[in-house]
């Protein structure tokens, strides 16, 4: 038997508000609690047998490591040339070696080239979070989160700020969910907390899988999330 409830306007407003709140929490949720050492050890043991095959799927022709190191060091020293900035963003967006790519990306490159001297003058105590906040405020649109996070990584890679994207974020969440089957999963990263969660996850895994490097764990998570985890 099916029952139909008659809702007045107040009930509808309350129900709509509740639904909107649930949608907001579903969209913005992050990892409920930090990864424990026991969980990190279990995940390290879980990925060890597949680590190298997954890692070897990474495309170094599309993302050449030597080129990355060159512009990364320029950013870390706070003196990237316009060419360094262009190369870095073309690399991140997967356009390396391409002559044609979206005009919106060309415009964003020019915008960041214009902003970098201002950042260098204004930032003062350039902690990773201050850097992230500065670029978030100046680019100030949701579509630039991954780019802002990448700039923050380039400047602060020595602080183990990861190259976050939807793939390694998805990989992290999928591995955590093998131990937390009821854990809600956020679809895409969108804020500073997500970056820190990924950073702490990678450090914890590395502590229990020391024959790997942080860079290798990053690439593994990218390929694992891209090729082995179902997108939701």
Please give the residue ranges for each predicted region:
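A short structural micro-motif
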Residues: 95-96, 157, 223-227
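Generic N-terminal initiation segments characterized by hydrophobic and/or small/turn-forming residues
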Residues: 1-4, 12-15, 86, 105, ...
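Long, highly charged, low-complexity intrinsically disordered interaction regions
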Residues: 22, 31, 40-136
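Helix-hairpin-helix
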Residues: 132-157
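C-terminal accessory module of base-excision DNA glycosylases/AP lyases that mediates lesion recognition
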Residues: 3-71, 79, 83, 162-232
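Generic hydrophobic, helix-prone segments enriched in Leu/Val/Ile
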Residues: 116-123, 138-139, 160, 176, ...
